[in-house]
Design a protein with these regions (language model features):
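Short, acidic, small-residue-rich periplasmic hinge/interaction motif at the N-terminus
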Residues: 26, 32-117, 150, 343
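Gram-negative outer-membrane beta-barrel transporters
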Residues: 561-568, 585-685, 762
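Short acidic/polar hinge/loop motifs at secondary-structure boundaries
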Residues: 159-185
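Membrane-embedded beta-barrel scaffold of Gram-negative outer-membrane proteins
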Residues: 343, 348-364, 492, 536-606, ...
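N-terminal periplasmic accessory domains that precede
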Residues: 75, 125-128, 143-144, 167-168, ...
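C-terminal beta-signal and adjacent terminal beta-strands/loops
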Residues: 251, 677-687, 712-765
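Flexible loop and strand-edge segments within Gram-negative outer membrane beta-barrel domains
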Residues: 59, 248, 262-264, 282-342, ...
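Transmembrane beta-barrel wall of Gram-negative outer-membrane proteins
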Residues: 220-247, 258-299, 328-348, 396-397, ...
Length: 765
């Protein structure tokens, strides 16, 4: 555990200890249970902000009559706490009014729904999001929403988290989530920067119920995952802490079709802390701190033949078993967010400052990589970022609500690369012993955006949300700006039917951490030389996006919806893994298009909760016009004049699940669930009968994975429960490929996880 992690952990534990000592009684940060489908139906046209997570009845804000006798300590504590809960509820509601997702398509998941998913709140965040419509699974925990590569924006309590270098691990823990929403489609003007989807998390806060949870999950792959969460409040102070440790032998997807990969251990440390202080009835400040440190072994593929020079001889003489390769990667992500929120009558605003440090270090097998590849690259990237965000809403009258805001993010990337190569002669053959080439450099990027929009209630059943935003991107490799109009219309012809349609123009800068920084010509005359030396700078993507959909409640508890979208882009951004390092590189397609349709449905009745999603999608691009040195000449020539599928395109993606809850068994309740994921497969290269290779012309075979589980809560004391849970992931042990090692920016085969048994034992108090 390095010094940065140790200091962050120590400071957060000290903060918790001090606050606990000051608190009269701790409070757990869970919201009241309610039966709901694992993925809620879209709330695209919900023009009213959701109710606060735990707003107390209005009566709680009035002072009770003076008691005839002195109150007990317990009743006095309740009388003190209820007004504070009401204040928090009003402030949460005000924050929701600042940043509503008017006209966009939003899928919500709450704490109860998390429990109804495989592994519950121990599930990785990417597995949670895979249950939403149109989300395709990729290797390394990657997600593709509506046919786009990454381009996801994460927010906590409405504040953006600056991007980091998160490649294999899942930085955010589902345990601190009170609720979350994935918002896609034609986004309102407040959303810029990353626009394929907005993952907005509302954290647990420690204001609702007393207690916490401590437990451990054990299971297949040598999994040992202890965890603890604890929340509390005392008057105006509220706090929450979540910490976990994870060790297993399935850190990265297996490159072979076996139960357990070779050399695939991971250790992960995660910490999240939340602190809030109510200044008065209309304002509060809050601080969030997160720290994650993750170590990964890179899994080996046994039986690989040695890499060869053009003359057929191996790069190095002798024998080396690929079973014994020792590549590793270390990742670290820390961030802090400080926010001030204020309500002044019809004016609501929130101002936040944030900072982040992120790093990824790939360490090669210095001998083995030379033997198999002729190249061994040690790559260390460190990204520091900071910025401010301000958002406000003002209700002019019953017909108009204005919203506006700004965001500025400044990033600095340090890249330290040492590449060990062989010298080669004019014929491309080894001509001497290996030697290192150092390439250390810095790059910088500044992103700034501002927006203004109006929510116009044209009629009782019609709302138009229109506005625009202006974005600027200045970096060491590119300088651009754009004005982006946005408009969404919501029509509710009946209480059970909602129709929405919208248009958005997007401006998406390239992720600084993925922009290639190494010089091309410094490798001329070596085993790492590229046959192409053209290296045009990576540019920002500009796109136009239209979206329309309808939702309908057919019967009490039964609802469904359909949503269609089309995007056409200039300088469409993509990225991939090139060479042997596992740090991605970004590039542009001159033109791109993505389109599709999503079908959703859910049914709730008593303890039964079900959902089903099916998404159809196509994503294509033409002509790579940046970072051309990443590709081989044949690929570059083909794509220059031909549209190809993007490597992350999956034509059909589906998910479905059902759960049932018996509330009174053993005083705590029993829950059982089953769900399934299906995909037609990500893209792979196609080889025609004539021997021509078409980039991304084929796809890996279609696949499915089914999961089942059961959870039992046993009441041992008032508000104290023992929880026992069994999850069986991929219950039929289906072996399926995520990648086969071919395709643009794909450098290795990867398989989905095989059957796993996981047992969780926890104590809620």
């Amino acid at each position: 555990m390095n010094r940065r992690w140790s200091l962050t952990l120590a400071s957060s534990l000290l903060m918790l200890t001090c606050l606990q000592a000051a608190a009269g009684e701790p409070a757990k940060a869970s919201s009241p249970n309610a039966s709901a489908p694992p993925v809620a139906a879209p709330s695209a046209a919900n023009t009213n902000p959701p109710a606060p997570p735990a707003a107390a009845p209005s009566a709680a804000t009035t002072n009770p009559p003076a008691p005839a006798t002195p109150p007990s300590p317990e009743s006095a504590a309740k009388e003190t706490q209820l007004p504070e809960i009401s204040i928090y509820g009003r402030l949460d509601q005000a924050r929701n009014q600042i940043l509503p997702s008017l006209g966009a398509t939003s899928y919500s998941i709450n704490e109860t729904q998390l429990d109804q998913m495989p592994q519950g709140d121990n599930a990785p965040m990417n597995q949670v999001l895979l249950r939403a419509p149109g989300v395709a699974e990729d290797s390394f925990g990657g997600l593709h929403v509506r046919g786009e590569h990454a381009n996801l924006q994460y927010r906590i309590n409405g504040v953006i988290i600056p991007e980091g270098i998160t490649l294999f691990g899942q930085e955010l823990d589902a345990r601190f989530v009170d609720s979350m929403a994935l918002t896609t489609g034609s986004l309102p003007a407040e959303y810029g920067y990353r626009t394929a989807g907005i993952v907005d998390i509302t954290t647990k806060t420690g204001i609702i119920e007393p207690g916490g949870e401590v437990g451990v999950q054990v299971g297949t792959y040598g999994t040992v995952r202890p965890f603890v969460e604890y929340g509390g409040s005392d008057g105006k102070v509220t706090y929450f802490l979540d910490a976990s440790y994870d060790q297993n032998d399935n850190g990265i997807e297996n490159p072979t079709d076996t139960q357990v990969a070779v050399h695939d251990n991971t250790e992960q440390y995660k910490l999240f802390s939340y602190l809030s202080y109510v200044l008065d009835d209309s304002s509060r400040i809050s601080l969030m701190i997160s720290a994650t440190h993750e170590d990964f072994q890179i899994p080996d593929t046994p039986g690989l033949p040695p890499g060869t020079q053009p003359d057929g001889n191996p790069w190095l003489p002798g024998t080396f078993n690929s079973h014994s390769l020792n590549e590793n990667q270390y990742e670290q992500n820390d961030f802090a967010i400080l926010s001030y929120q204020k309500t002044l009558g019809d004016l609501n605003y929130q101002i936040s400052g944030f900072g982040r440090y992120s790093a990824a270090h790939f360490i090669p097998d210095s001998f083995g990589d030379l033997f198999f590849n002729g190249v061994a690259s040690d790559v260390n990237r460190m990204l520091s970022s900071g910025g401010v965000q301000g958002d406000a809403s003002y209700k002019l009258n019953d017909q108009h609500t204005l919203r506006g805001g700004i965001m500025v993010v400044d990033e600095l990337l340090t890249s330290e690369t040492t590449t060990t190569v062989f010298p080669v002669d004019a014929n491309g053959n080894e001509s001497g012993p290996s030697f290192p080439i150092k390439d250390n450099n810095y790059s910088q990027a500044l992103f700034a955006g501002m927006y203004l929009q109006d929510e116009w209630r044209v009629a009782p059943k019609v709302t138009i949300n229109y506005g625009g935003r202006f974005d600027v991107f200045n970096s060491s490799f590119d300088n651009e700006y754009q004005f982006s109009p946005r408009v969404n219309t919501i029509y509710k012809p009946t209480d059970t039917t909602t129709i929405h349609a919208g248009y958005a123009r997007y401006f998406t800068p390239p992720p600084l951490e993925n922009v290639p920084t190494s010089g091309v010509t410094i490798f001329n005359g070596t085993s790492n030389a590229s046959p192409i030396t053209l290296d045009s700078p990576v540019r920002a993507e500009s796109s136009d996006y239209v979206d329309a959909g309808i939702t309908h409640k057919f019967l009490p508890g039964l609802q469904g919806g359909v949503d269609a979208y089309y995007k056409w882009a200039h300088e469409q951004i993509d990225d991939g893994l090139f060479g042997q390092t596992l740090i991605p590189s970004a590039f542009n397609y001159e033109k791109g298009q993505v389109y599709g349709v999503e079908f959703t449905g859910s049914y709730i009745q008593g303890g039964l909760s079900t959902y089903a999603n099916v998404a159809l999608s196509q994503a294509k691009g033409e002509n790579w016009d940046s970072a051309q040195f990443l590709f081989n000449p044949a690929q570059l020539a083909y794509v220059k004049n031909n549209w190809i599928y993007l490597d992350h395109e999956q034509s059909v993606t589906a998910s479905a699940g059902a759960s049932y809850t018996w509330k009174k068994t053993f005083g705590g309740g029993t829950m059982a669930y089953a769900d399934v994921l299906f995909g037609t497969g990500l893209r792979a290269d196609e080889t025609t009968s004539s021997g021509e290779v078409i980039p991304n012309g084929d796809h890996v075979p279609s696949y499915y994975s089914a999961d089942v589980g059961v959870e039992q809560k046993v009441k041992v004391h008032e508000k104290q429960f023992v929880k026992v849970r069994l999850d069986i992931v991929n219950v039929i042990d289906n072996s399926y490929e995520l990648r086969n090692g071919t395709g643009v920016g794909v450098n290795a085969a990867q398989y989905g996880a095989r059957r796993g048994f996981f047992v969780t034992l926890a104590y809620d108090f």
